Amino acid sequence: MSLSFRVDNTAGPARRGVLSLPHAEVQTPVFMPVGTVASIKAVPQETLEELGAQIILGNTYHLYLRPGVETVRKMGGLHGFMSWNRAILTDSGGFQVFSLSELRKLNEDGVTFRSHLDGSSHFFSPESAMQAQIGLGADIIMAFDECTEYPAESARVRESMELTARWAARSRKYFEEHKHEVPWKAGSTVKFQVSSDANSRNLKPETRNFDGYTQSLFGIVQGGMDPALRKESAERTIEIGFPGYAIGGLSVGEPRELTREIVESTLEHLPKDKPRYLMGVGTPEEIVEYASLGVDMMDCVLPTRAARHGLLFTSEGKISIKQARYAQDQGPLDPNCDCRVCRRYSRAYLRHLYASNELLGQVLNSVHNLSFYLDTMRRVRASLDATSTRPSGVQGCPEP
């Protein structure tokens, strides 16, 4: 058994569902914080649990380079290595290799690239990417794909889409032959995390035996900014057969309006009974917008990356805490936010921490931004539970 997914309610194309995975029962739509190297930057695991994070991401490319897949595998996979007993998704490393355009060579077999750490040469293929992700042991893993740059010539996009389809078939073949090698010990048990409501802050532990449970491999739809190629990619990926489908290759520099157009048109071609994952987006307003279109899963580095640069999301709009006007501001960061940061600290103190380059500033900023994102998705789920005509979620911000 890999995953099960059910849709409990709809409002137009938006869906309210439950995704059951080996390590957690995930309420959807869901935002997934990104932990590139098995760490959500500046935020410890116990804080993530308090914030209600149901599922987080790890990055295969970075973990392959350091500490190495074998190190993680010997410790029971990422769950044991990072002491996280909720769900995890790993990407295939394809996007990161794509970003190393000056350091990589691509052919039918796979991609040869140089490490950004020490310049050493490495090779990723669909098979080796699956081998690495099986060793990392996430609940959901991703097929190996290629992401095209923006803008790109139509011939280049077609060639890349067709390569991704062939790699998807190879990814699934290897996965089906080796999925039993996941580092969960046969007969071992885990404190399975269950949440039955839209809150998801207080997940209840239940003991689950891992016998019979496997990872789930998602296929990825590519095709650049061409709706026809996206349709063809979706059809070919569905023909291969996966328990879930991702929309990749977006947020690579294209206008937001074009992103929405491609997401909306691609969703029309994806199965309604399978989870849909939009990779690498976006702002709080955007994740509400994409949930309203029928996306079930989203991830983005923005909340923590922006936090480290002093950009904070609030119900009153974005705040650049580095600005001098906050130096004497005794008010909370967001008067409508109930996170631990807004309950305790003033804008003046947060501005002081940033100006002083104190690490605590990065921690508190990151905790707030993640809380804002996760609370936004909780409100989206609550609005769908209430069968509203469209999801709402970002307090005080105009609907997209």
Model-flagged regions — what are they?
Residues 149-154, 158, 244-251, 359-362:
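Glycine- and acidic
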Residues 69-72, 307-320, 374-377, 386:
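C-terminal helical cap(s) of enzyme catalytic domains, especially alpha/beta-barrels
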Residues 1-184, 324-327:
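Non-catalytic, usually N-terminal nucleic-acid engagement modules in DNA/RNA processing proteins
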Residues 178, 216-218, 222-333:
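Glycine-rich phosphate/ribose-binding loops and adjacent secondary-structure elements
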Residues 24, 56, 91, 133, ...:
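Conserved, mostly hydrophobic/aromatic
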